[in-house]
């Protein structure tokens, strides 16, 4: 998947140009784009009165205009907050991207792992324009634990976008598939895989509920919201760190709370 991100960035931007991402963000994006010489501009997600993470549409529009950005990465479901964006939210985001003439990468690698009660809406499905300006990325790696096989795929309806991405991809051969990953993908997407994912989603919901309640009960000062998708919990430890006279740059071990990576890169 990151290979396609790099190829698309090479196809539609030049070194030194800016790309818009939401913050917090998947560190794989930032690493790849920085290595490609692109400037990263972040639009912070904000929490509403119920602690639900939301996009700041005004901030997105302002930063796209200020930095003359025409290439953006949209993560749906969102990594690492676990938000499963609603159709209206995606429509508003795509309207802003359209107004600023952006090519959009929609990372939908977590699309199979929505928790019960939530439904993934493909970005390309919300409008005709979204279908034509979006490069959608998918993979079985998160859902079926196949990341080590390095197999993903993209859906690009717009022929011009597709031709340019495929040309950029062909230069490095980084995106060439291998036989093992192809057959693993085929096997995962068979009916047996559907049944397994349905069972997995129930287990993840139970685990998320347990972890959420346990952390709130045992770690005063740690803030979190229940995820709607993915298998991650995004924690705000700022108050906890103040109470324990530490900071996010210091590895900590406190009863069962152990932090080997600070999360600052997100």
Residue ranges with predicted function:
Residues 1-95, 112-113, 120-125:
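Conserved core of the PLP fold type I
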Residues 256-259, 263-266:
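Single conserved hydrophobic/aromatic residue that forms the stacking wall/gate
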Residues 108-110:
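Conserved Walker B
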Residues 38, 99-102, 131-132:
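A short helix->loop->beta-strand "cap" motif at the edges of active sites that frequently abuts
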Residues 71, 103-104, 135:
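Hydrophobic "anchor" residues on beta-strands that sit immediately upstream
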Residues 133-217, 222-229:
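PLP-dependent aminotransferase class I/II
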Residues 16-18, 131-134:
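Short acidic capping loops at alpha-helix termini that bridge into adjacent secondary structure
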């Amino acid at each position: 998947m990151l290979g396609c991100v790099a190829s698309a960035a090479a196809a539609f931007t030049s070194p030194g140009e800016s790309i818009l991402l939401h913050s917090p963000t998947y560190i794989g994006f930032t690493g790849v784009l920085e290595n490609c010489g692109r400037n990263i501009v972040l639009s912070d997600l904000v929490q509403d009165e119920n602690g639900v993470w939301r996009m700041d549409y005004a901030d997105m529009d302002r930063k796209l205009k200020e930095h003359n950005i025409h290439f953006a990465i949209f993560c749906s479901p969102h990594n690492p907050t676990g938000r499963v964006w609603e159709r209206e939210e995606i429509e508003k985001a795509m309207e802003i991207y359209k107004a600023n003439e952006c090519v959009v990468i929609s990372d939908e690698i977590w699309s199979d792992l929505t928790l019960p009660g939530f439904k993934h809406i493909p970005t390309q499905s919300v409008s005709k324009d979204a279908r034509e300006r979006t490069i959608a990325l998918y993979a079985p790696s998160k859902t079926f634990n196949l990341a080590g096989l390095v197999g993903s795929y993209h859906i690009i309806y717009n022929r011009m976008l597709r031709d340019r991405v495929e040309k950029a991809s062909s230069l490095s051969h980084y995106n060439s598939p291998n036989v093992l990953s192809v057959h693993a993908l085929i096997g995962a997407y068979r009916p047996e895989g559907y049944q397994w994912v349905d069972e997995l989603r129930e287990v993840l919901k139970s685990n998320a509920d347990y972890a959420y309640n346990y952390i709130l009960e045992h770690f005063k000062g740690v803030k979190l919201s229940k995820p709607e998708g993915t298998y991650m919990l995004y924690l705000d430890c700022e108050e906890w760190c103040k109470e324990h006279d530490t900071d996010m740059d210091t590895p900590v071990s406190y009863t069962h709370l152990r932090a080997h990576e600070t999360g600052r890169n997100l």
